[in-house]
Structures are given as C-alpha cells and as structure tokens.
Regions:
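A well-structured
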Residues: 1-306, 318, 591-598
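Catalytic zinc-binding patch centered on the HExxH motif and its immediate surroundings
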Residues: 307-312, 345-365
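Conserved helix-loop functional segments at active or binding sites
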Residues: 323-334, 360, 389, 393-401, ...
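Post-HExxH zinc-binding segment in Zn-dependent metallohydrolases
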Residues: 407-436, 445-447, 451, 525
C-alpha cells in the first residue's frame, strides 16, 4: 500500500483547526497576546505572593494564561504530526516550543512562591474546590524543591530534556524506511504505518511473514540511534530523580501520578504471572483454528476468523461509535456526536504522518484526534478509543477548572478503553450466530486487552528492567535492549509464540518510553474501565457513575476517583476480577468454536 500525499485526501478526512486559530498569523498573534499577559502577570505578582488572598487572586489570573497556553501548545504541535516533511508545520511547532519554554521560565516565580508558601496557606488554598489538584501537586513538589535558581535552570532546559523524544519521533516518521517485499509473486509496498495498521493483521501467512521481515530490517538500520536517544532519556530522568532527592527514578516518575511503587509493580507482576497463561491459551486456540503448526511473532496479531474482518468506511464507523456509546445516555452522546460535523478527527493515512494515534485537549474548545484510517475494524477501535479520551476532556473541562481538569496519568486510559468495551459489547449483541459472537469477543481481546494488557504492559516490564539497570549504575546499547525485550517477550509468551531476533526489536516501535512510566497505565486504566463496564452492566446507576467519574477530572486522587464506580484499587481485587473476566471470555470463545466444529 503506497501512501498518498496529504493534498490527495478529501477535506472531510482532515481535521479543521480553525476552531483554535484561523491561520498561522492568527496563531502568532495569540502568542504575542499571551506574552503580554504573562509579562503583566509577572509585574503584578513577582515578589508579591505571600498571603492566601494573594495566591487566590493570582490563581484566577493565571488560569486565563494557562488556557491561552493550552490552545497555543496544542495548535503548535498538531499540524506537524500530520506531516513531518512540511517545513511550515515545523516552523509552527518551533514557534510554539520557543513560546512554551519562555512562558514556563517567566512563570517559574509563581511555582517557586507556591512551594515556598506556609503549609497553612497551602491548606486553605487546597480547600478551594477549583484548586484541589494544583495544591496536591504543589505539596508533592514542595517535598523535593531545589530552590528558585536551580528550578529556573531546569525549566530553561525543558527543550533539551524533550530532545530524545523529538529525535525518536522524527526518526520514526521520516527515517524508518521499509523495503518492498514479495509474496505469492506480487510486490507490496511497506511502511511503518501500513505494517502496524494493516499487514500485521493480514490473513495471508506469507504476507504477514514477509512484511514483518521487511519491517524489522527497516527498524534494525536505526537501532543504534534509537538506543542512544533512549539512553539520553533515562539518564536525564535518573539525574533529575537524584537531584530532587527521590529514593529512585521509579519514585520520581510515579510521584505526579499519585500512586506508589507497589501499585506499579503489582500491575506488572500479576499480569505477567496470572494473565500470561490466559493469553497463551487464546493464542494456541487461534493457531489451532487457523491451522498453524507454530505461531511466530509475525502471527500473534492474526484474527481468529479472518473472513469476518470486514472493511469499514469512515461513515460506517461513525454509526458504530454512536450506537456503541448509547448506554451512556443522551448527555454523553450529544457531546461526542459533534466529532463528525465539526471535523475533530484527522483520518488521512498520508506520507510523513505520525504513525500513532492521540487525542488533544485545547481546554474548552473541543478535542482533536489524530489517526491513520486503513478501513479495518481495528481502526474503529482506535477511533472509539480516542473518542473516549475526547468525551473525558469535554466533561472534565466543562465541570472543572483548568487546574482540576486533567486526570492522573495512572487512570487516564480508563475513559478510552471503556469505550472500546462498549464497541465490543455492541458487536456481540448484534446477532445470535455463534460465529458473530465469537468474532466480537475475539476483538474484545485482541483490539482492547491485548493492546493494553500485553503490548503496553510488556513495554512496562521492559522499562522496569531498563530503569533498574540505570539505578544500578549500568548503561546500555541496542544489543542490550534487544536482549531485554527478547527476555520479556519469552517470559510472557512461553511456548505459545516463537520469539526471534526480529521480535526483539519491538522496543523501537513505541514513543511511550519517552513519557516516563506511562506504558503500565494503559493496563491500570483498563482495570478501572473494566470495573466501570461491569458496573454499567449490573447497576442501574452505572452510566451516571461513569459520567461522574469523567466529570471529576483530576479533582480527586486515583484511589478516590475509582471509588466513584465502586472499585477499590488499593487492593488487587479489581485487577484479579479483570483477569477472571478475560479468562471467562477465552472460555466463551473456545466454546463458540466448539459449536462451529472448530
């Protein structure tokens, strides 16, 4: 599949950024306006923040500045992710990055004053409903504050600290070139996006195998550069952890999530130990149904029933999304239904585009979603996942101050994966045919849980080993990273999948390693979304409670938020319940196969 240029796609498949700014000039004017407001704020409050009343007034004005920064920050990076080869987009991104650095430096005096404030002042500010999250975070920072000069220097170095991720992202979008491959006498084009979104799920074994080898060879050419970028990332995080007096880099990276190391380790350890046998059982069943004597890493994304993997249009996907979210009620449906008419989503699978997907949240404008549409059902899962994030953004933004709107990273993936469960539930109940039901349950596993409970969880297990190396004063290169990834994959998959040296390059496929301890939160969020889904199925207040969770934003801690839907994540019960739910799902799938004589 050869990728088209962005100009070849119809307007309806491209997002409309004019809800933010009309054009580049409008964007640049917004930057100048924000600079003026920041300068005035500095003149008014620098050296004048002492009392509760001082801070209360300053917070009100600072919120308006942060909202401007939210709009500028989102607009600056989004265009470039649609085409990394576009110089105009690169210039917009640089202008936004320069502004963000300058603004952050100019406003450090406020953070310095806040963490230096008396506990009594912080306690009174924390009692204000619109500042609960900001003050919780301030108290966390206060315990590890390095002083005004050092903190300002670190802020000035923000762009430098971001460089490893920037290098990796641009390398993945612009430098990863996959050679053409031949299968059954036919030549196929390959790329990062087409492999990830199309070939790895292909029903033909030779296409899967040959595309995987082409894909892996393309990765291998850049493994040393990728390893160097990743080493720079983790060494800088370790340096900051030590400077700030944390016991370990793990404690430093988990602090702002408001969870402890035990919750991080529990997520990885229980899934590696108790969910791995469930996943192995399912893949062995897939191999049996598809007549495979062995399953390689090129095969593990194979659909259980490839013949029932229909092409889906963007228009059909809209209907699927809206029908799936109906159980959440009119209030939710009316908000997310806007995504089509207002063109929130950038669907075009054009050359130079970021291969991933994301949802962006310019505060109280409307969300934006980036993805690459290839017409497979997995794309519908990606879409409804990002619409899940979007729904949370809308409800949090509408019901919380800017300071309280952002969920903890620990469970930020709950709203997105919850929507995936609604899609699978809708598909499952569209027919009494065992083949159709098996199809829906299989996609529940492969498109939701395998992605979040396996792909991202194994990233987290890999990360834990890498950070442990750094904690012990060691270093690494590409060879060591390949070895660690191969070890993690082998531990999880056992004899269900043949793990080779190409599989060991999997660490090169995700940008999550540049986002701290983010990967494990996909499974943590999915535990909360599973609890919410089961609560929706079994409680009359399930939909209302879920919307209340979305509306709470970051106003509560992760433990408090999960209790809104009755999930006590201080224990391992929600995680064990989720694993049991998945084991039951595999049993159902195998039972349907037996009914079909397979």
């Amino acid at each position: 599949m050869e990728q088209k240029h962005r100009s070849e796609f119809p307007e309806k498949e491209l997002w409309d950024l004019t809800a933010l700014y009309q054009d580049r000039e409008d964007f640049l004017r917004a930057i100048e306006k924000a600079r003026e407001d920041i300068n005035q704020f500095s003149r008014d409050y620098k050296g004048n923040l002492h009392t509760f009343e001082d801070f209360e007034k300053a917070f009100a004005e600072l919120e308006q500045i942060y909202i401007q920064m939210s709009h500028i920050g989102n607009y600056s990076f989004m265009p470039q992710t649609t085409d990394y080869g576009n110089e105009d987009f690169a210039n917009i991104a640089q202008a936004g990055m320069d502004f963000e650095t300058d603004a952050s430096v100019a406003l450090t005096f406020f953070d310095d004053a806040l963490v230096a404030a008396d506990e009594e002042v912080l306690d009174r500010l924390g009692d204000l409903p619109h500042l609960t999250a900001a003050i919780r975070q301030a108290k966390i920072k206060k315990a590890h504050y390095l002083g005004a000069d050092v903190e300002k220097t670190l802020t000035n170095l923000g762009e430098v600290f971001y460089s490893p991720q920037d290098i990796y992202t641009k390398m993945r979008a612009g430098d990863f070139e996959m050679a053409d491959f031949e299968a059954h006498g036919k030549t196929y084009k390959n790329s990062f996006v087409t492999y990830e979104n199309f070939y790895q799920n292909h029903e033909d074994a030779e296409v899967r195998e040959k595309s995987f080898r082409s894909f892996s060879e393309g990765l291998r050419k850049h493994q040393n550069t990728a390893a160097a970028a990743y080493l720079a990332q983790v060494k800088s995080e370790k340096l900051l952890a030590d400077m700030k007096g944390y016991d370990s880099v793990f404690d430093y990276l988990l602090a702002e999530q408001e969870v402890d190391r035990a919750m991080f380790d529990r997520q990885i350890d229980l899934i590696m130990k108790d969910f791995a046998p469930v996943a192995q059982r399912y893949l062995k069943h897939v191999a049996k149904v598809n007549g495979l004597e062995k399953m390689t890493f090129a095969d593990w994304k194979l659909d259980l029933d490839s013949a029932l993997n229909p092409e889906v249009s963007i228009e059909d996907a809209y209907d699927l999304v809206m029908k799936s979210v109906e159980p959440l009620g009119q209030e939710y449906c009316q908000e997310v239904a806007r995504y089509q008419e207002e063109r929130w989503v950038d669907f075009a699978a054009n050359s130079g585009k970021d291969s991933g997907g994301y949802a962006a949240d310019p505060y109280r404008v409307h969300p934006y979603v980036l993805m690459s549409w290839t017409g497979r059902l997995s794309d519908v899962y990606t879409l409804i996942h990002e619409i899940g994030h979007s729904g949370q953004f809308i409800f949090s933004d509408n019901h919380q101050s800017y300071f309280n709107a952002h969920m903890s990273t620990y469970y930020v993936e709950a709203p997105s994966t919850f929507n995936e469960l609604l899609l699978s539930d809708y598909l499952e109940h569209q027919s009494d045919d065992p083949r159709q039901k098996r199809f829906a349950l299989a996609h529940r596993l492969t498109d939701t849980y395998f992605h979040n409970f396996i792909t991202h969880l194994l990233e987290a297990a890999f990360q834990r080993k890498v950070y442990t190396l750094i904690e012990e004063g060691e270093t690494f290169g590409a060879s060591k990273l390949n070895s660690i990834m191969k070890e993690v994959l082998t531990e999880f998959w056992g004899d269900a999948i043949e793990i080779d040296d190409d599989a060991a390059l999997t660490w090169m496929r995700q940008a999550h390693y540049y986002m701290g301890l983010y990967s494990y939160t996909y499974s943590a969020g999915l535990v909360i979304s599973t609890a919410g889904y089961l609560h929706l199925k079994h409680s009359e207040t399930g939909a209302e409670d879920w919307l209340n969770l979305l509306k709470s934003g970051g106003s509560k801690t992760p433990l408090e938020s999960a209790m809104i839907i009755g999930a006590d994540i201080s224990t391992d019960k929600p995680l064990r319940d989720t694993i049991q739910f998945l084991s039951d799902t595999v049993d159902q799938i195998i039972n349907y196969s037996a009914q079909l004589g397979e």
